[in-house]
Regions:
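Short, aromatic- and glycine-rich surface loops/edge beta-strands on solvent-exposed regions
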Residues: 117-139, 241-269
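Bacterial N-terminal signal peptides that target proteins for export
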Residues: 1-9
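Bacterial N-terminal signal peptides
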Residues: 8-17
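Signal peptide processing junction and immediate N-terminal pro/mature segment
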Residues: 18-26
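N-terminal Sec/ER secretory leader and immediately downstream segment
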Residues: 25-113
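Short helix-loop boundary/capping segments
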Residues: 136-210
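Structured domain cores in non-transmembrane regions
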Residues: 81-169
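Extended low-complexity, serine/threonine- and proline-enriched intrinsically disordered segments
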Residues: 76-102, 181-227
């Protein structure tokens, strides 16, 4: 069912960050602060509810056709300057749950499907202070070419992120309502934020012979300085881009549409090898 949003609300949404989801291979060299182990009290650490993430896993299972052959992973990125990811650790922790979570080199990870841990009110807990990290779902269909992402993969990341509470947004009654709707990713023209591996220059949508360059306004996020402390994409804005799935699918773009990325540091056409 479609949801009507007044024009004033739509304008507000354009300024609100609804990001999921980061691409693998982010450069973390710019973070130079020393690693600080945070005390274990709930609320002191940067963490997420496993119960909510478990619900997101169920969404992934129900929507597998959007990302054929893909697995569901998660990923963390630095949310602000001075956050070092060296020595980062993750643990699934509850009153009766203690499970270490291995991290890949790009800081992505899988989580077990553990109904008992969800009932235990367990948390996916890092050894970083609250507010240090940006969390995303990570879904990539096998065989996707380098420097591209599939539209269906990104849409499924949005669906999972909404349910799993991995979407950072400016607190407001409207934004809270949106996250509770059955399928806001497809039924509303909301901006979802994603990250690439390197600073972005442009993005092209490609499906067969059809090719369209995304507007520059969809790159690097809107300028809203008063909201920077609430936006989890601002520190990584040179790699950030916004997607609105509803209009794209209404225009006939399909799940297998590719987003092709051109990066700031790519060699110009015709450059000598």
């Amino acid at each position: 069912m479609n949801h009507f949003i007044p024009r004033a609300v739509l304008v507000a949404l354009l300024l609100c960050p609804f990001p999921p989801v980061a691409a693998a291979g982010q450069d973390h060299g710019q973070a130079a602060a020393a690693v600080v182990e945070v005390p274990g009290a709930r609320g002191d650490r940067d963490e997420k509810s496993y119960r909510k993430i478990f619900e997101g896993m169920e969404v992934f299972e129900r929507n597998r056709p959007l990302a054929p052959g893909a697995t569901l992973r998660f990923k963390v990125l630095p949310r602000r300057a001075g956050v070092s990811l060296q020595g980062l650790t993750m643990q699934l922790r509850g009153a009766h749950t203690r499970i270490a979570i291995p991290l890949d080199a790009d800081l992505s990870f899988e989580l077990p499907r553990d109904a008992a841990a969800a009932q235990d009110d367990a948390m996916v807990t890092s050894n970083r202070k609250a507010g240090s990290l940006t969390w995303r779902a990570e879904i990539r269909s096998p065989g996707t070419p380098a420097k591209t992402r599939r539209l269906g993969d990104l849409l499924l990341e949005c669906k999972v992120g909404m349910v799993a509470d991995l979407v950072a947004y400016v607190p407001s009654p409207v934004n809270l309502l949106i996250t509770k709707l059955p399928d806001p990713c497809r039924t509303l023209s909301i901006n979802m934020f994603y990250f690439t591996e390197r600073p972005l220059f442009s993005i092209a949508l490609m499906q067969g012979a059809r090719r369209v360059i995304l507007p520059a306004a969809q790159l690097h996020g809107p300028d809203a300085p008063m909201l920077t402390d609430l936006q989890d994409w601002y520190f990584l804005r040179d790699k950030a881009f916004m997607m609105q799935f509803k209009p794209l699918y209404e225009q006939g773009w399909q799940d297998d549409t590719l987003l092709q990325f051109d990066y700031m540091d790519d060699d110009p056409p015709g450059a000598a090898l």
